[in-house]
Amino acid sequence: MTVTRGLEGVVATSSSVSSIIDDTLTYAGYNIDDLTENASFEEVVYLLWHRQLPTASQLKELKQQLADNADLPQAILDYFNMYPIEKVHPMAALRTAVSQLALFDEEADTMDSEANYRKAVRLQAKLPTIVASFARIRKGLSPVAPRKDLSFAANFLYMLDGKEPDVIAEEAMNKALILHADHELNASTFTARVCVATLSDVYSGVTAAIGALKGPLHGGANEAVMKMLTEIGTPENVDSYIREKLVKKEKIMGFGHRVYRQGDPRAKHLKLMSEKLTKLTGQPQWYDMSIKIENIVTGEKKLPPNVDFYSASMYHSLGIDHDLFTPIFAVSRVSGWLAHILEQYDNNRLIRPRAEYTGPGMQVYVPVEKRQEL
């Protein structure tokens, strides 16, 4: 057998959801640059699920469906109050809440395509409510009920702090949600597909995906970037901090990518929003530090920034808690997970790869009383 560690370069399935070709990311044939500058997140959700952009009436219907399904069962909110809040990472709370949602859905184990689509709508609608509600409850604040008159991005920000966001904040969140919505066969998406390929339910697939996204090598990088920026403190400290890490051969979070060779096409959009927001909020040091870090790392290591690098300072400028960065990733990426889950169901085959055995050769059983300690 030939082993490909990390399955790098292995084509494991075919998909019509998104593609990465020659460092260009597209959703169902639409360039990510085009979508980020022109579309709403709701349009992108529809695109990922249907492989075409919605008409005005189709978009209105989806928005209404999302608004109608955004509320959480009271029991989920009650469970949040039972968690050891000071110890629970929001990703763990999100993973648990999504699994619990299945208990309140009468269609949880109904596997026809129409029921699966309805569950997709419910999950897409409820994830931002879960994240925002937990974020407030752990601070001793009451959850903010979702509003039906706001966009998906604006409503998410509104539920987080109870204030209707301004146009710039809404634009920033909308762009971030679009940019994180799907990314071909990444670790969490592959996890979701492996799970539902067993014909497990939609909730199980999304719960498994959240578990994969929780890992720092996948979804936690922007939180690590913000931790690094906080440790650096000021632009004047960047040079010594980064060069010391490079000398020690320590990883600089937010740079390089397994798939992209010339640079992550999503990063430039977040870089622009980071610059705009940090200046508008009177916190230009976060962007200034990021620029200095980028110049050193790209110059010394030839590694361009990825989607995680500038999203950190952008989210921070929006006043979002650092440990919510990865849950926000999930709020967006669930749209892609659901698209892949529905696609897997439509043309399913159990995913069962092989492993090269590297253990001992054939051995003979020895009774326990005759075994010698090594």
Positions of the model-derived regions?
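Non-transmembrane, aqueous-exposed alpha-helical and coiled segments at domain scale
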Residues: M1-L374
